[in-house]
C-alpha cells in the first residue's frame, strides 16, 4: 500500500486499474496535485472551493498543502479540510519555525525532516503530544547534504537484479548514476536528525515512513536504515514501516499489522531484520489481500500460479 503525496491526476486512474484487477500494483492512494502558493488561495471561500474538487472529483481523502502561503492561508487549508473531511498533509519547507506552526495549527502530517539537527524537550513534546504524523524523509534530509546520493554511490542500485527487472535500464541508470553531490562523511548530519526522530517516537509521537520517490522500491529500505542510524531499535523501525504508516493514512483498522479482521497483507523475509535492519531487503514472498507473490519476480504463487505480465520495456520490440 502506498500513498503518493504529490502526483498528477492520472494516478487516480492507475489506482482504479489496480483496484479493478486490470493491472498489477500496490493499493494506491494519493493527494493528487499538491496546492502551492501559485494557486493563490487568497480567501477561505476560494480555498474550500479548490478542495471540493479533490473531494468530489478525485474522490481522495488526502490533500497536500505545499507551502500555500502565509499562516492564515495555511489555516484556511486546515479549516476547509476539516469541513470536507480531508486529511491535510504539509511540506516541511526546511523551516523549523514554520513546522512548529504546522503542528500547532492542526495539520495531520508534517513531511520532511526538521532542518535543525538537535531538538530538545519542547519540540519533542510538541510533536509527541499533538499526535501529528511526522514523516522525516531522511534520504533528502533538510539542513545538510542529502544521504540519497551517498546510497546511489555505495549501494549501486543499477547493478541490483531486482531493480533491473522492474525498471527500464536507461531510466534506472539515469536516476542513479550521478555521483556529483559528494561530501565528506563528517558533513552529513542525518544521524543527528535521526536521533531527533527517535526522541519523538520514544516520547509517544507518531513517526511514519516516506522515501520521496527518487528510487522507488528500495528507497523505503534505505529510509529504514537511516532511522536505525540514530538509535531507533529494529522493532520500532518495523513499526514505523507498517502500523505507523497505516495510521498515517487513516487505515489502521484494515492494514498495518497481522490481526483478525484485517486484510491479509504481509511480507516474508529470509533473514531476521530484528538482528540487522538491513535484512529488510531479504524478501521471499509478498502477500496482498491473501494473494501470495514471489518477492523476486512478483509472479503469483498462491492461491493460483501465474507469471506476471512482462512490462512494456521487456517486450521484443523495445529490446
Predicted features along the sequence, with ranges:
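Acidic, glycine-enriched loop/beta-strand segments at the rims
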Residues: 218, 233-238, 248-283
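Acidic (Asp/Glu)-rich catalytic clusters
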Residues: 17-23, 55-56, 103, 125-129
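Active-site-adjacent beta->alpha loops and helix N-cap segments on the catalytic face
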Residues: 7-17, 67-80, 118-129
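Short, acidic/polar
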Residues: 39-54, 93-100
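Extracellular/periplasmic ectodomains of large secreted or surface enzymes and adhesion receptors
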Residues: 289-319
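Divalent metal-dependent hydrolysis catalytic cores, especially in the metallo-beta-lactamase
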Residues: 1-10, 25-35, 53-69, 78, ...
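Divalent metal-coordination and catalytic microenvironments
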Residues: 28, 81, 110, 134, ...
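Active-site neighborhoods of metal-dependent hydrolases
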Residues: 38, 49-69, 115-230, 303-305, ...
Amino acid at each position: 500500500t502506498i500513498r503518493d503525496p504529490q502526483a498528477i491526476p492520472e494516478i487516480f486512474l492507475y489506482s482504479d486499474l489496480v483496484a479493478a484487477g486490470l493491472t498489477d500494483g500496490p493499493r494506491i492512494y494519493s493527494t493528487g496535485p499538491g496546492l502551492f502558493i501559485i494557486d493563490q488561495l487568497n480567501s477561505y471561500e476560494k480555498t474550500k472551493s479548490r478542495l471540493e474538487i479533490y473531494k468530489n472529483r478525485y474522490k481522495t481523502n488526502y490533500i497536500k498543502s505545499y507551502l500555500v502561503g502565509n499562516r492564515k492561508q495555511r489555516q484556511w487549508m486546515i479549516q476547509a479540510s476539516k469541513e470536507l473531511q480531508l486529511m491535510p498533509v504539509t511540506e516541511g519547507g526546511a523551516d523549523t519555525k514554520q513546522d512548529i506552526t504546522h503542528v500547532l495549527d492542526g495539520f495531520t502530517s508534517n513531511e520532511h525532516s526538521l532542518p535543525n539537527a538537535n531538538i530538545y524537550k519542547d519540540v519533542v513534546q510538541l510533536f509527541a503530544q499533538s499526535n501529528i504524523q511526522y514523516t522525516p524523509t531522511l534520504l533528502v534530509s533538510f539542513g545538510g547534504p542529502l544521504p540519497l546520493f551517498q546510497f546511489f554511490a555505495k549501494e549501486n542500485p543499477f547493478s541490483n537484479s531486482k531493480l533491473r527487472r522492474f525498471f527500464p535500464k536507461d531510466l534506472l541508470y539515469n536516476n542513479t548514476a550521478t555521483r556529483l553531490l559528494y561530501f565528506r562523511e563528517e558533513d552529513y548530519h542525518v544521524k543527528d536528525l535521526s536521533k531527533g526522530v527517535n526522541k519523538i517516537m520514544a516520547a509517544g509521537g507518531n513517526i511514519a515512513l516516506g522515501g520521496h520517490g527518487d528510487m522507488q522500491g528500495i528507497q523505503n529500505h534505505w529510509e529504514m536504515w537511516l532511522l536505525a542510524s540514530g538509535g531507533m531499535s529494529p522493532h520500532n523501525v518495523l513499526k514505523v514501516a507498517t502500523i505507523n504508516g497505516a495510521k498515517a493514512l487513516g487505515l489502521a483498522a484494515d492494514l498495518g499489522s497481522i490481526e483478525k479482521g484485517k486484510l491479509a497483507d504481509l511480507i516474508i523475509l529470509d533473514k531476521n531484520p530484528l538482528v540487522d535492519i538491513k535484512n529488510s531487503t531479504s524478501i521471499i514472498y509478498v502477500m496482498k489481500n491473501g494473494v501470495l507473490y514471489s518477492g523476486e519476480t512478483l509472479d503469483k504463487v498462491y492461491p493460483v500460479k501465474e507469471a506476471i505480465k512482462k512490462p512494456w520495456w521487456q517486450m521484443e520490440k523495445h529490446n
